[in-house]
């Protein structure tokens, strides 16, 4: 986290960057926790440090993070659908974040090939937290071949006859 902080400050000073993206949170380490084995406390420190850095530099910092395995164990209509509580290793991530978006492709969790085919290419960006706005879901198109998501609202529709 110290190296990240120094690098972000340098980039802001030299190049006036307006956004920092961290891929991904669980790869970072906190020097004050080296040698200790409480990863949740360490992730909480890192999360708070990133939040403080964003405020200091007055820029948004987008942080990618892994989820735990809980979504895979869910059944019924919400099978696989991620929730805030699924953020891996710390509840502090959801506390510190201004916005939490979770990507979900229902087809990934289906066993039936026919159901899978019906949902192929469909995804959702679940806005699970938004400090200054509404939560909900944004329908997306998943382009797996190029690892890209697009807003489904802009898909071309066939004209009705």
Predicted regions and their residues:
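Conserved H-loop
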Residues: 64-66
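Conserved ATPase-coupling elements of RecA-like P-loop NTPase cores
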Residues: 29-36
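C-terminal regions of RecA-like/P-loop NTPase motor modules
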Residues: 1-19, 34, 48-58, 69-161
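Catalytic P-loop NTPase motifs of RecA-like helicase/translocase cores
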Residues: 28-29, 70
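…and closely analogous acidic/polar surface helices at protein-protein or active-site interfaces
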Residues: 42-47
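Conserved Walker B
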Residues: 25
